[in-house]
Amino acid sequence: MHESFADVAALDEHLARPTAAAVEALARLDGDVVVLGAGGKMGPALARMVRRGLDAAGLTARRVTAVSGFTDRAKAAALERDRVATVACDLMDRDAVARLPDAGLVLHLTGQKFGTGSDPARTWAVNTLAPAAALDRYAGARIVLFSTGCVYPLVPADGPGADEATRLEPAGEYANAAVARERVAGFLAARSATPLLLFRLCYAVEPRYGVIHDVARRVAAGEPVDVRMGWVNLIWQRDAAALAIRCLEAAAVPPAALNVTGLERLSVRALAERCGALLGRRPVFTGAEAPQAWLWDARACHARFGPPETTADEAVRMVCAWVARGGESFGKPTKFEVLDGRF
């Protein structure tokens, strides 16, 4: 799949377009849906995809509620126009979470990564208190809890990557807070026999954010591309959102974990050179490839759900086309090149 996007509206429509498999999964599942932490980079598109998927399945009466702090009220209003109910809520406030609407299906996106170096206490709080409140409120529901591939340690860059059996012994406060998020949620889910899937998402990308965006913008601006983290795995955000919906069926007792990323192991240097070819710029590099990297083995995901619809090169072409025409950026660098886990 390779699309070009004339504007933000066209891009947002694409990112919220459900796959046929996501529609079929929603048709098999029962209950209303709540999306916790829906105000971030991925949340609005995921909430819209759920709404559109239910509508496509003829289940228009089922309710979709997006929950976030919603400091940007325009974001909430836009969701409401698309028939997604919104609730402004501090997801670390157990009393406020207890008042959220009932749901049989929960997508939990709440988390904090950036700013950990300056405020580590808040990172630990967000990544543990919010899932604890959610697991109490929605005990018995099917829950997909977004996690990260950073829960694993760095692995040899020439190996297959960390799989779900790899010990969770990462570097850095953020990654360890992410492990704590999984442990707290797993404990509470097991105690209440709540079906839970730990969705270890590894570098979702779209034109305004992500590793490809970061590399493409640096190449376009003539800025050096850091290749110390020499290899990456990626997945197009629409594919990741569709998989999150499908993973509601994979939520299990005891909790299950799944690495969610693309099939291809990409060289950052080669990625920059590809962006340079598409943008008409010669990339500049800094650093040298380390012998280890954050890489993930997602064969279990692909065996169950099949490969993502969007290839890595299709994603590169879509991002570079967006960057070339001066499309907007979220202005949130991924810091993918970090090797010590300090974000």
Can you describe what each PLM-predicted range is?
Residues 1-23, 312-343:
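Amphipathic terminal alpha-helices
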Residues 230, 243-300, 327, 338-341:
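Mid/C-terminal beta-alpha module of Rossmann-like enzyme folds, strongest
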Residues 32, 105-108, 113, 129-173:
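Conserved Rossmann-fold NAD(P)-dependent oxidoreductase catalytic core, especially the SDR/UDP-sugar
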Residues 165-168, 194-200, 214-239:
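A conserved pocket-lining segment of Rossmann-fold NAD(P)-dependent short-chain dehydrogenase/reductase
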Residues 32-52:
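N-terminal Rossmann NAD(P)H-binding glycine-rich loop of SDR-like oxidoreductase domains
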Residues 179, 191-195, 204-214, 221-222, ...:
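Glycine/proline-rich active-site loop of Rossmann-fold NAD(P)-dependent oxidoreductases
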Residues 119-125, 129-130, 151, 156-198:
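Catalytic helix-loop patch of NAD(P)-dependent Rossmann-fold dehydrogenases
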Residues 44, 70-73, 78-126:
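NAD(P)H-binding glycine-rich loop region in Rossmannoid oxidoreductase-like domains
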